[in-house]
Regions:
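Catalytic Tyr-X3-Lys loop
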Residues: 95, 108-134
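Amphipathic alpha-helical dimer-interface segment in Rossmann-like NAD(P)H-dependent oxidoreductases
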Residues: 124-157
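Flexible N-terminal pre-Rossmann segment of NAD(P)-dependent oxidoreductases
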Residues: 1-9, 27, 110-112, 148-159
């Protein structure tokens, strides 16, 4: 996969898989990278680490909620303005709300079912919004192509965007 000189967005970038992927994209010489996470402190630390090593502002930190559409649009707008059209997106943000689907209260003997709102939140972050971050990239590539006068995609153009 060609990474050099492409612009990337990584959600969940402050830790774990997102952080490791962001560092690898930078090692592979991504042109610019948007780092996205709820945890602002570790996110800024990572951006500072990347930018210091690169000697330029390669990494742009964005602290916010990946399920917020306005936030997603702002990340893509600012990243595109600073580095160009995003061609790689890594929707690595995820949350874990572990518990049994049904628990029996030891004292009362009553069943407690996993809260629907918590389940919805997990689905929103882990399943639904990664698709929206990918579609945002695809839409912006399509607009960029149209603005450059390109119509149909041709196989010899190779890959236009990558979702990891």
């Amino acid at each position: 996969m060609q990474i050099t000189n492409k612009v990337s967005v990584v959600t969940g970038a402050a830790s774990g898989i997102g952080r490791a992927t962001a560092l690898e994209l930078v090692a592979q010489r991504t042109k610019g990278i948007a780092l996205v996470d709820l945890n602002e402190g570790p996110l800024r630390d990572l951006a500072d680490e990347i930018n210091s090593a690169a000697g330029s502002e390669v990494a742009l930190p964005f602290a916010g909620d990946v399920t917020d559409e306005d936030f997603r649009v702002r990340v893509f707008d600012e990243t595109t303005r600073r580095h160009g059209t995003v061609q790689i997106v890594v929707p690595a943000a995820g949350i874990f709300r572990d518990r049994m689907a049904v628990k029996i209260d030891r004292d009362s003997g009553e069943a407690d079912i996993y809260p629907a709102e918590v389940f919805r939140q997990v689905l929103e972050v882990n399943l639904i919004h990664p698709v929206y971050w990918a579609m945002e990239m695809i839409a912006r590539i399509a607009v960029d192509r149209r603005e450059r006068g390109l119509k149909k995609w041709l196989a010899e153009e190779k890959i236009q965007g990558t979702i990891i």
